[in-house]
Amino acid sequence: MASDPPPPYPGGPSAPLLEEKQGLPRMEEPRAAPYPQAMPFAPPDCGPPPYDANPGYIAPNPGFYPPPGPYAPMGYYPPTPGQFQPPYPSQYPSPGAQGTAVIVPPGPSSTSAATTVTSTTTTVTVLQGEIFQGSPVQTVCTNCQQPITTKISHDIGLMNFLLCCFCCFVGCDLGCCLIPCIINDLKDVTHSCPNCKYHIYTYRRMC
């Protein structure tokens, strides 16, 4: 008992010697695996992008996958916040929309829009004395502004008075001098409006 060696201290210098002494195989420490060598990095191609047949289509990034959901049609760009976006026309008509007529009664706005403003213009008619003679004339009344045919009346004028004086001078003084006063072709002609009785013109017969 006294000749036996003391037990080895774990981890001490005599531990491997004890294993060799007893004939046990020596365990080798595991070696660290070498790091893989880095692959050479190829520089990116800086050439022009490939030509796309659709100019309105924007190709997504190689590593980007669009989320599932409805998409806008090709060539459509979303409007800005201040821009009005018209609603999409419905592809399918709503049930009951076919054969339905909606009648909108005219309101005050439509009545005011249909009202036309007419300006009243004053027409100045220049009447010439030679057209107003012993017969009615078609003209426009200067008072009521209506197209009319004048109403004529015969009045004793200067022509009748001169012919009466001439008859008295030649000796027709026993009532024969009054004969020119009853002849309408020797009297003055007054033209008036048949509607408003307005005096338009007087045609005076001169010698």
Curated annotation (Swiss-Prot):
It is a peripheral membrane protein. GO terms for biological process: apoptotic process. Residues 1-54 are annotated as: Disordered. Residues 1-13, 41-52 have a biased composition (Pro residues). Coiled coil: none annotated. It is found in: Late endosome membrane; Lysosome membrane. Residues 18-31 have a biased composition (Basic and acidic residues). Keywords: Apoptosis, Endosome, Lysosome, Membrane, Metal-binding, Zinc. GO terms for molecular function: metal ion binding. The keyword Hydrolase does not apply. Residues 121-205 form the LITAF domain. It comes from the Eukaryota. Zn(2+) binds at C141, C144, C193, C196. Its main location: membrane. The keyword Metal-binding applies. Residues 161-183 are annotated as: Membrane-binding amphipathic helix. One of its GO terms (cellular component) is cytoplasmic side of lysosomal membrane. The LITAF domain is stabilized by a bound zinc ion. The LITAF domain contains an amphipathic helix that mediates interaction with lipid membranes. Belongs to the CDIP1/LITAF family. May act as a p53/TP53-apoptotic effector. This is Cell death-inducing p53-target protein 1. It comes from Xenopus tropicalis (Western clawed frog). The lineage of its organism: Eukaryota, Metazoa, Chordata, Craniata, Vertebrata. The gene is cdip1.
